[in-house]
């Protein structure tokens, strides 16, 4: 027996049903989008009211400022965006991070001859606080990170490199890849590293280790001690400065020397 073909009417019916389902789906999607837009608008309004109410706390308290920034991020609001909108006029946070960015640049330039353009976030934070004086708004390390991210518009000069549980701030336009970052992390505890330490810890060939260290030397980010016992030591000024400061604090507080 031959199967009967599907009639033109049935095909038309099927297409009409599909079109209706598609139309219904579009309407539902538009409704959901409208509801989400209304919710976001309501969140934004509430956030503006919250900001107006807690304006002074946001400006003066670094921890409160972090929480506020996180609240803004959840609905895609950037209080640091340039331009004179509600946020910059209400809170002055745009000006705050701009001024902080300028101060960060000044500190990094002043110390560049000493550390080659790399500094720990903790040391940068200390210098920034020292330069601001007692009457200025308090600044947290989170504030410094946010200000540095805004400085990226100036080019690839400024960046943040994770090292262990902390960060290094890069203020020179040196190209640092993953190999360089791993070596910086390895040098974190002592402030220096050797070719053999890199080879044994990272399972690298000699040439790869030397290539990375030579690049750091060329960029002024590392110094070499050729007279060190055993083999040459490659010192990272940013790291050993921080370690030296830690040691002084321990000595002053009566800790182990």
From Swiss-Prot:
GO cellular component, one term: ESCRT II complex
Pfam families per the UniProt record, alphabetical: EAP30
Family matches, as SUPFAM superfamilies: Winged helix' DNA-binding domain
Coiled coil (residue ranges): 28-50
Subcellular location: Cytoplasm
Keyword vocabulary terms for this entry: Coiled coil, Cytoplasm, Protein transport, Transport
Gene Ontology annotations of biological process type: forebrain development; multivesicular body sorting pathway; optic chiasma development; protein transport
InterPro entries: ESCRT-2_cplx_Snf8, Snf8/Vps36, WH-like_DNA-bd_sf, WH_DNA-bd_sf
Record text on subunit structure and interactions: Component of the endosomal sorting complex required for transport II (ESCRT-II), composed of snf8, vps36 and vps25.
The protein's role, per its UniProt record: Component of the endosomal sorting complex required for transport II (ESCRT-II), which is required for multivesicular body (MVB) formation and sorting of endosomal cargo proteins into MVBs, and plays a role in autophagy. The MVB pathway mediates delivery of transmembrane proteins into the lumen of the lysosome for degradation. The ESCRT-II complex is probably involved in the recruitment of the ESCRT-III complex.
Family indicated by similarity: Belongs to the SNF8 family.
Name used for this protein in its record: Vacuolar-sorting protein SNF8
Organism of this sequence: Xenopus tropicalis (Western clawed frog)
């Amino acid at each position: 027996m031959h199967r009967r073909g599907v009639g033109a009417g049935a095909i038309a019916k099927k297409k009409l049903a599909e079109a209706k389902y598609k139309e219904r789906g579009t309407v539902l999607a538009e409704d959901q989008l409208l509801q989400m837009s209304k919710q976001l608008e309501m969140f934004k309004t509430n956030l503006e009211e919250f900001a107006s109410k807690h304006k002074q706390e946001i400006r003066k308290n670094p921890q409160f400022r972090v929480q506020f920034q996180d609240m803004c991020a959840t609905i895609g609001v950037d209080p640091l965006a340039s331009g004179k909108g509600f946020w910059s006029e209400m809170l002055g946070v745009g000006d705050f991070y701009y001024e902080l960015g300028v101060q960060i640049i000044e500190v990094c330039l002043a110390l560049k001859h000493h550390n080659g353009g790399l500094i720990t976030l903790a040391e940068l934070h200390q210098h920034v606080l020292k330069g601001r004086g007692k009457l200025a708004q308090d600044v947290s390390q989170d504030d410094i990170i946010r200000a540095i991210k805004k400085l990226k518009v100036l080019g690839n000069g400024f960046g943040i490199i994770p090292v262990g549980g902390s960060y290094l701030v890069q203020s020179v336009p040196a190209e640092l890849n993953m190999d360089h970052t791993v070596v910086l992390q390895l040098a974190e505890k002592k402030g220096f590293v050797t070719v053999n330490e890199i080879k044994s810890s990272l399972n690298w060939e000699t040439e790869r280790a030397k290539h990375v260290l030579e690049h750091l030397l060329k960029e002024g980010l590392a110094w070499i001690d050729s007279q060190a016992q055993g083999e040459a030591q490659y010192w990272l000024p940013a790291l050993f400065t921080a370690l030296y400061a830690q040691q002084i604090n321990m000595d002053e507080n009566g800790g182990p020397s």
